[in-house]
Structure formats: C-alpha cells, structure tokens
C-alpha cells in the first residue's frame, strides 16, 4: 500500500476543551507518523486563504470567526492510505452523523466547531500541507 501524507487540524474548541493530547495520542495509536506539527493562531487572512473554496457559502463567516477564535494545531500525518484512514478516525463532518468513537463524535460541539479537519483527497492534502509548511519543516520517510 502506498504511503501518503495528509493534513489534520485540531481546531480551537478541541484545544480549549483540553482534548489536544488525547487527539494526538489517537493519531499515534492508529499508527500515523506525525512528520510535521505547529501550533498557530490564524489571522483572518490566513483562515480565509485556507478555506477559500467555501467563500461563497452561507457558513463561511462563522467558520472563519471560529478558526481565528483561538489557537489551532496543524499536523502532517504519514501512513499507508493516510487520507482515508484519517477521515475514518475523524468521522463525519456533521458530528450528529459521526459514528461513536470518532474524533468528531467525541469532541465536536457543532457542525462549525467540529474539533478537527482532515484533507479529503491527495490534491487537497498537498495544497493544505503546502499552505502551512515549508518543505524543510516536514520530516518522514517520503523525505529520506
């Protein structure tokens, strides 16, 4: 199976609710290698740039205001089939639809404040990783 990289974001509500360590532990327990990690407090411009594909949707302003409301942690995860596996661990975007035991079922407060983000495709993963990380800030088997 092909080794992939994906981006995951631990969002402000999960950090505020002291779930950061538990969420990271769950990624590690699922055999992801964390090959890049940063804690950031996004500016409005950074949040708008990251979520640009949603700019014409009704929830855009609420999403941006939430994402700048506190610190986030961005992670580059590496494993075989990383994108699908990360999405499985995260759960459905709407926590009401998330399967018990997924991160969103356990830590999301609402559809907007849904605790975590995960890339949904290889193309998105590459774009999102490059949005937050320079090549020299990501380490792992793909770089050796």
Curated annotation (Swiss-Prot):
Domain of life: Bacteria
Binding site for ATP: 11, 59, 87, 93, 104, 114
Substrates-to-products reaction catalysed: a 2'-deoxyribonucleoside 5'-diphosphate + ATP = a 2'-deoxyribonucleoside 5'-triphosphate + ADP; a ribonucleoside 5'-diphosphate + ATP = a ribonucleoside 5'-triphosphate + ADP
Cofactor(s) the protein needs: Mg(2+)
Active site: 117
EC identifiers of the protein: 2.7.4.6
A GO MF term: ATP binding
Alphabetical UniProt keywords: ATP-binding, Cytoplasm, Kinase, Magnesium, Metal-binding, Nucleotide metabolism, Nucleotide-binding, Phosphoprotein, Transferase
Location(s) in or outside the cell: Cytoplasm
Cellular-component GO terms for this entry: cytoplasm
One Pfam short name: NDK
GO biological process, one term: CTP biosynthetic process
Quaternary organization: Homotetramer.
Similarity comment: family membership: Belongs to the NDK family.
NCBIfam families: PRK00668.1 (NF001908)
Function: Major role in the synthesis of nucleoside triphosphates other than ATP. The ATP gamma phosphate is transferred to the NDP beta phosphate via a ping-pong mechanism, using a phosphorylated active-site intermediate.
Protein name: Nucleoside diphosphate kinase
Source organism: Baumannia cicadellinicola subsp. Homalodisca coagulata
UniProt lineage: Bacteria, Pseudomonadati, Pseudomonadota, Gammaproteobacteria, Candidatus Palibaumannia
Gene: ndk
């Amino acid at each position: 199976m092909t080794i992939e990289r994906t981006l995951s974001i631990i969002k402000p509500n999960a950090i505020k609710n002291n779930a950061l360590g538990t969420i990271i532990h769950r990624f590690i327990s699922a055999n992801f290698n964390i090959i890049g990690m940063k804690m950031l407090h996004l500016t409005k411009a950074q949040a708008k740039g990251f979520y640009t594909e949603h700019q014409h949707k009704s929830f855009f302003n609420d999403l941006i205001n939430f994402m700048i409301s506190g610190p986030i942690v961005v992670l580059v995860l590496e494993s075989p089939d990383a994108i699908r596996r990360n999405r499985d661990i995260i759960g459905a975007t709407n926590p009401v639809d998330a399967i018990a035991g997924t991160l969103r079922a356990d830590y999301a407060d609402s559809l907007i404040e849904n605790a975590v983000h995960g890339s949904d495709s290889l193309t998105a993963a590459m774009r999102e990783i490059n949005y937050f990380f320079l090549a020299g800030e990501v380490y792992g088997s793909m770089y050796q």
